[in-house]
């Protein structure tokens, strides 16, 4: 059979404290139709072998719109906070008045204000719970609470007060934090700001990761400066908020090179694809982005995306090379080789200048041994990097290094300062490795380093047949190069050590040297040789 008792129990599910007598009349007013003994037991009521909490009885009474007299009794059985919360939920102003009449000193109940949906009751309740006696303090407290709990009509009613006391910005910040979308829109259009900070709503949207807040900010009838939109785009890139970035890009249609550079640096490939679809960035901007991607150690996919967007003939800018070296990004080198204008020699030179051994080693895979050693030794000499020079010469065949350095010295002929450095470096290397003196003499003769040539001759064993042959070769070199001092010194040195039999052969060599000088029309050298030959004939006759 249908049981009113069971039906009533379905509505009883909360809990209270403090009990008083219940009567049959009271229960009938509440809609509970039981007969039998009623026993009070602390926080519960015992009716006909059934237990009911005081809180559940109060809640049921409010739900059934019970008489105020009954409710006046029931609110005394429970804690004031619970009674107030239930009264707010059911929008019972009379019950709230009753509760406060019994509890003149109450703690702050701001945290339960939001339980009511009535503006009038919200304001009425605030009158009781606000402790301040100052009117302005009470008003600001009410407006902060109204903003916190999304009571727009209260704010609208007090708009003039908000403007007059310049609290619009502070209230707006609360609305943003609580994500009250409609309230935010009202603030932005109601003209209540003292000085509106355009970034407040955007910053809050990013801080909370709330896309709906960003949409509100974009749709507000406000003209934002471009620098703010760019800044927000950069924030979206940093946080990897693709939806945020897309919304800003499509809504405001603002583009700057810094956007693509940041996207490359933070390895945001989806954002890069979105930007490339706009077809507005030139090759130079993409190269700058590539440099940023290298700096940020972006993935190979991101690097390939940037490289594939470049014109194959576009000259690679220095910042790309410097980024590879500075940030030691070895992985990008094979990818950049696909660019026709990428110069591994340039990269190697910068790596040597910055003493980046890792990049230098990585370049080995893309250069022949001769080319690698030529570039490394040349830059090591020019930059006076003794450590690098020793690193690449200690384990290698000394004669191979000597030959490579000869080529370097010849190529530096138009750079006398650097050539002098290379000559000195070669001389020290030759001395350290104790190589045959003949090879050094010929290099010094070829480049007309007379002082170093003389020093080398002093250190040489002039009676050694190989040294004599080297000096004769130096004669020929000097004749061809028009190095008169070298020729004269070699001539005099050989006369001192040659036997009579050797002098006859030497005379023929001098005559041949004159022919070499005449081929290039070195008149000064020809006159010098003629004068030497004239005196030499007398020596032979003797």
UniProtKB/Swiss-Prot annotation:
The keyword rRNA-binding does not apply. It comes from the Viruses. Keywords: Early protein. Induction: Expressed in the early phase of the viral replicative cycle. Belongs to the asfivirus MGF 505 family. Plays a role in virus cell tropism, and may be required for efficient virus replication in macrophages. This is Protein MGF 505-11L. The lineage of its organism: Viruses, Varidnaviria, Bamfordvirae, Nucleocytoviricota, Pokkesviricetes.
């Amino acid at each position: 059979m249908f049981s009113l008792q069971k039906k009533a129990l379905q509505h009883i599910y909360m809990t209270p404290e403090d009990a008083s007598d219940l009567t049959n009349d009271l229960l009938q007013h509440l809609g509970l139709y039981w007969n039998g003994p009623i026993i009070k037991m602390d926080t519960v009521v015992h009716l006909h072998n059934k237990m009911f909490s005081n809180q559940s009885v109060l809640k049921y009474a409010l739900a059934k719109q019970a008489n105020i007299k009954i409710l006046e009794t029931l609110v005394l059985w429970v804690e004031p906070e619970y009674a107030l919360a239930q009264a707010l939920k059911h929008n019972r102003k009379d019950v709230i008045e009753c509760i406060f009449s019994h509890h003149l000193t109450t703690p702050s109940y701001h945290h339960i204000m939001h339980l009511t949906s009535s503006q009038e009751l919200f304001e009425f309740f605030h009158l009781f719970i606000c402790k301040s006696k100052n009117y302005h303090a009470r008003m600001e407290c009410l407006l902060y609470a109204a903003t916190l709990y999304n009571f727009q009509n209260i704010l609208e009613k007090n708009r003039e007060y908000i403007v007059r006391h310049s609290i619009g910005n502070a209230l707006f910040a609360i609305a943003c934090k609580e994500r009250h979308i409609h309230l935010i829109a009202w603030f932005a259009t109601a003209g209540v700001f003292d000085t509106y900070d355009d970034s407040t709503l955007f910053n809050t949207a990013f801080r909370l990761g709330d896309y709906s807040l960003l949409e509100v900010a974009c749709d507000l009838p406000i003209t934002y400066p471009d620098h703010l939109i760019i800044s927000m785009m950069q924030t979206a890139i940093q946080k990897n908020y693709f939806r945020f970035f897309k919304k800003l890009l499509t809504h405001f249609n603002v583009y700057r090179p810094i956007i693509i550079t940041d996207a490359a640096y933070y390895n945001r490939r989806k954002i890069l694809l979105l930007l490339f679809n706009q077809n507005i960035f030139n090759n130079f901007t993409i190269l700058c982005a590539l440099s940023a991607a290298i700096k940020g150690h972006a993935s190979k996919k991101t690097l390939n995306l940037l490289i594939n967007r470049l014109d194959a003939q576009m000259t690679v800018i220095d910042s790309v090379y410097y980024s590879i070296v500075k940030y030691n990004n070895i992985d990008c080198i094979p990818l950049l080789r696909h660019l026709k204008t990428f110069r591994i020699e340039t990269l190697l030179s910068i790596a040597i200048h910055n003493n980046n051994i890792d990049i230098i080693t990585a370049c080995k895979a893309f250069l022949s041994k001769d080319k690698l050693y030529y570039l490394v030794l040349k830059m090591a000499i020019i930059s006076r990097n003794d450590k690098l020079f020793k690193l690449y010469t200690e384990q290698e065949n000394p004669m191979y290094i000597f030959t490579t350095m000869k080529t370097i010295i010849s190529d530096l002929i138009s750079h006398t300062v650097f050539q002098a450095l290379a000559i000195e470096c070669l001389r020290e290397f030759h001395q350290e490795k104790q190589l045959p003196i003949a090879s050094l003499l010929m290099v010094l003769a070829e480049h007309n380093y007379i002082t170093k040539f003389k020093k080398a001759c002093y250190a040489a064993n002039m009676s050694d047949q190989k040294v004599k042959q080297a000096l004769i070769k130096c004669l020929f070199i000097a004749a061809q190069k028009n190095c008169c001092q070298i020729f004269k010194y070699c001539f005099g040195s050989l006369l001192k050590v040659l036997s009579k039999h050797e002098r006859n052969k030497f005379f023929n060599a001098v005559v041949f040297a004159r022919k070499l000088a005449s081929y290039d029309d070195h008149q000064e050298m020809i006159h010098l040789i003629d004068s030497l030959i004239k005196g030499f004939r007398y020596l032979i006759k003797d």
